Swiss-Prot record:
The modification Phosphoserine is found at S384. One of its GO terms (biological process) is embryo implantation. The gene is Ggn. Residues 127-491 are annotated as: Interaction with GGNBP1. Residues 1-268, 285-584 are annotated as: Disordered. Residues 527-536 have a biased composition (Basic residues). This is Gametogenetin.
Amino acid sequence: MGNVQSEPSAGGGSRKEQASDRASDSRRTPLVEPEVTPSSPAMRLARGLGVWFPGSSGPPGLLIPPESQASSSTLPLTLELPSPVTPPPEEAAAAAVSTPPPPPVGTLLPAPSKWRKPTGTAVPRIRGLLEASHRGQGDPPSLRPLPPLPRQLTEKDPVLRAPAPPPTPLEPRKQLPPAPSTCDPQPPSRRITLASSATSPTESQVRHSSEGQAAGGAHGEGEMARSATSESGLSLLCKVTFKSGPHLSPTSSSGPLAAKASLGASGGGGLFASSGAISYAEVLKQGPQPPGATRPLGEGPRAAQETEGGDGDGEGCSGPPSVPTPLARALPPPPYTTFPGSKPKFDWVSPPDGTERHFRFNGAVGGIGAPRRRTTTLSGPWGSPPPRSGQTHPSSGPRRPTPALLAPPMFIFPAPNNGEPVRPVPPSPQQIPPLPPPPPTPPATPPPAPPPTPQPPALPRTPILVARPPTPGPGHLESALAPTPPSTLSPTAAAEQAPAPTPAPVTSQVPATTTAELSPPMPQPKIRTRRNKGPRAARGVIREEGTSGDGPREPNMAPVTDSSSGGGGGGSNGTSTAGASNKGTARHWPPFEVLNSCPCKCYCRHQRRHRRLPRNVSAWLSTPTNHLSEPPWVATVKLAGSLVAGLEHYDLQATHST
């Protein structure tokens, strides 16, 4: 069982698969033969367990009657595990075979042991993992193709690798100790078309032995041909019915998948091993797929775990999806869907429909550091909370103000799109007085959303419900800020919501917001300005004044004024139009220009005084002052050297010449 346990390191399905790999090391190489090979550890194990092999006419000790193997009718295979904690794999398997407990593993999928989960103790599991690592089977299944046929672990029955081919077979997933009992109950409805016997904790082994028997009996060596063998036929072989009922956990879905995977990969194991993600994903799909067996309550979580890569350990119960592989496959598992995207990504990307994206775009499009920073900052409040309505706004209110301060809001939501200058409230405060009135009107119109889209910055996408203009100065700023969150909300609602959270931040940015509100003509240029400057704004309103060549420059104006100008020397030119549009812009972009022109506030090589060497350096570099024409430290070094050398006389000239 422990071997069956999948490696934690391997991705979801791959872990179990790995376990099976390491379990069936010898089998792994020959897809078909190894399982049957009497000498193979799996074989011995299976025999010990009482697994019936293809050579045998019937399963020696297995519960699965030959009839069950032969007939496709689902056989309620009740391999009982003596206890959730599996005895040593062989013992456990034997016990399972001897005492078929109610919980049979759901899936008989022979291919990847990865799907089979030993219900047994973690120790065996760990041991299996270690074993696998030593064998070199620890590699993620995805990396190394593993013949699904031989997937049975060393302790597992050697048999079922071959049966894996049948898509119908459900790979038995070990249920966790508690789950097994539940799993068992699944009526034959869970018949495993796969020639595998499902068992519980030990079932993994027993299951394999069963599978081996079934596969062996039906297929004889054919189990080796598992992939060649018709999947349905194979499933016949080990028509083990796992009564997994709802308990069958993702494993149940796993079975068909495993079978399918084995078929897909010439070496059943290959599929699982080679594409751990796929098999795992498929298993997930199948998990939901096997409607026949109600997923255990834990199934959903299990599936998720599987997706996460928890597949190996987490799945306590292995439910064989009675549903044929096609069906199982047809059903994409919700977990799998999640699986494709990393959770973190989905968490912040998915929820913030527009806000996060806007910020991100600002960063990407603007190409300015500030936007990136903003994204991070807003990531929590903006990105995290899906609510773009008032809720989002309040939560991000403090942070959002920062965005508002940044030009991004303004140029993100260009008023021009709607033709309402108010939309891009975020412009610099300069516009506050002139635009306050217009913003009020825009608030009514939610169309701002489209204008934001035009804006390069993603942020603007949310219409700036700068309509917030209620307050001519700060009010507008707030509105501009708020609009981003409210974009989702109706303009009015957004405007209303934005004001509360935004006010504080807006206060600092108020002028900028007002500027944004300025007039539709400005919006396009502003967009550019906003974007470039947005980062600066994000860094802080102060940054504008501080960064600017001239400290006196008003911070408010700077942010609103050409953010693009501020962003880059070239930007200022581009924003000149914007500047013209924004009354404050004309005054403010020069600061940005000043920055580019280096107004002596910065320490740069353009200024003579900055190029001068330090006084002490120039002093010793000037021959008239320093007869040695060498830095004082050189003389000191020489003196020290002479002292060390024990020279009684320190001759500067001699030392120098030397």
